[in-house]
């Protein structure tokens, strides 16, 4: 029954949302609203993540309200743009809790923004669904904190799984000096030890660096390296990719899921050709097998997104969609917006098929995705291609 409910909410949000509440469009306006707060980096260095998140949250809140709301209640969405600054994320989180009186928060585009919000939501007892990637967000488990994207640990595991298939066992790592990059480095080091991969180089670069040739020259001169992994967000990974090709490095180049967006390919240009990275099925929706449970969801989401914004679908938009749908499904199952009951309902999410995979949470797992929710993709002729 629960799986059916999840599927109904996800499907009707895109196609026939009147079925969510069973009411006619506009009827939701008479009831008390479900107050959803959001903090995203719609501008600033992480805008290629946060802008599509903001657009999707606003789009689906409006579509759900036009269809009658959730259980007859409209969704009242309050969105703040932190510009990629953790201190602003903390300030806006406090405002959402104390002034706006939200029932649940969806957001935290970056790991830094999320971790700035975590102590505030934990103290206040407000359910918080992060849109950021680092495993530290949910490990160890925090009572009120959940997340929708795959973790950096999973990304490292998927990359090393692919390396092993290619007979590669020696890795050079370049990580960004951001919260995401630091956590990604930590997880890569740990996973390498577990997977029998030797880390032969360990370099860092600044999130705003416009040239990384010094670090890459060290990698080029390292005779032991067989592959290179970059952990970063925004323009940095594109800079690394361009410098990589300019130096004539021929080793296989991997990126993290933090750049699973066409924006990365646009920024890196032809230098991105051949780059591999782990990503959600959303970026290769048309290439998924018809038997894949995600196929219908990601195909429909892609159509709605691209029809609405006249731009290619974004993985990060999908994270926001999943966060909102999980939150609203939990409201239905909790029978309202009592925060403790809502938190419990989010934790009890089972079998939600979203853009990131099939989500089954528990008291020990506040993300709910497994490694098979990730797909290895490669840039071919300026587009994503599923690696088989």
Across the structure, where does each feature detected by a protein language model lie?
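Immediate post-signal peptide segment of exported/extracytoplasmic ligand-binding proteins
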Residues: 25-38, 66-74, 164-169
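Extracytoplasmic "Venus flytrap"
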Residues: 34-58, 80-87, 109-110, 174-182, ...
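Short, low-complexity disordered leader/linker segments with a strong preference
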Residues: 1-35, 66, 97, 388
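Segments of small-molecule ligand-sensing domains
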Residues: 304-317, 328-384
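Extracellular/periplasmic periplasmic-binding protein-like sensory domains
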Residues: 241-319, 383-386
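Beta-alpha junction/loop-to-helix N-cap segments that form part of ligand/metal-binding clefts
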Residues: 48-55, 67-137, 148, 205-209, ...
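Periplasmic-binding protein-like
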Residues: 96, 100-109, 129-131, 170-175, ...
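Extracellular/periplasmic Venus flytrap/periplasmic-binding protein
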Residues: 91, 135-137, 143-248, 291-292, ...
């Amino acid at each position: 029954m629960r799986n059916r409910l999840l599927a109904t909410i996800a499907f009707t949000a895109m196609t026939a949302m009147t079925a969510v509440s069973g009411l006619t469009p506009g009827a939701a306006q008479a009831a008390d609203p479900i107050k959803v707060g959001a903090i995203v980096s719609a501008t600033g260095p992480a805008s290629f993540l946060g802008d599509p998140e903001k657009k999707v949250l606003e789009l689906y809140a409006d579509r759900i309200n036009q269809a009658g709301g959730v259980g007859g209640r409209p969704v009242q969405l309050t969105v703040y743009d932190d510009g990629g600054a953790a201190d602003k994320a903390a300030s806006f989180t406090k405002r959402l809790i104390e002034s706006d009186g939200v029932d649940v928060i969806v957001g935290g585009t970056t790991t830094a923004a999320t971790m700035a919000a975590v102590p505030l939501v934990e103290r206040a007892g407000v359910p918080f669904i992060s849109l950021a990637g680092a495993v530290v967000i949910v490990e160890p488990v925090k009572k009120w904190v959940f997340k929708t994207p795959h973790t950096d640990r999973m990304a490292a595991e998927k990359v090393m799984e692919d390396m092993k298939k290619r007979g590669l066992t020696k890795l050079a790592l370049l990580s960004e000096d951001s919260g995401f990059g630091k956590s990604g480095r930590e997880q890569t080091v740990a996973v390498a030890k577990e997977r029998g991969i030797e880390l032969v180089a360990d370099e860092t670069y600044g999130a705003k660096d416009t040239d990384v040739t010094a670090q890459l020259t060290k990698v080029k001169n390292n005779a032991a390296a067989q592959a290179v992994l970059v952990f970063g967000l925004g323009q940095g990974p594109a800079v690394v990719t361009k410098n990589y090709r300019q130096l004539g490095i021929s080793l296989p180049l991997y990126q993290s899921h933090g750049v699973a967006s066409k924006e990365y390919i646009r920024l890196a240009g032809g230098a991105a050709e051949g780059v591999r990275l782990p990503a959600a099925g959303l970026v290769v929706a048309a290439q998924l097998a018809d038997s894949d449970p995600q196929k219908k969801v990601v195909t429909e989401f892609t159509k709605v997104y691209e029809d609405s914004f006249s731009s290619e679908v974004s993985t990060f938009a999908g994270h926001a969609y999943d966060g909102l749908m999980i939150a609203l499904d939990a409201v239905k199952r909790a029978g309202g917006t009592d925060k403790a009951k809502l938190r419990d309902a989010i934790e009890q999410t089972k079998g939600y098929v979203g853009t990131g995979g099939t989500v089954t949470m528990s008291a020990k797992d506040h993300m709910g995705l497994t490694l098979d929710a990730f797909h290895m993709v490669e840039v071919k002729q300026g587009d994503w291609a599923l690696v088989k």
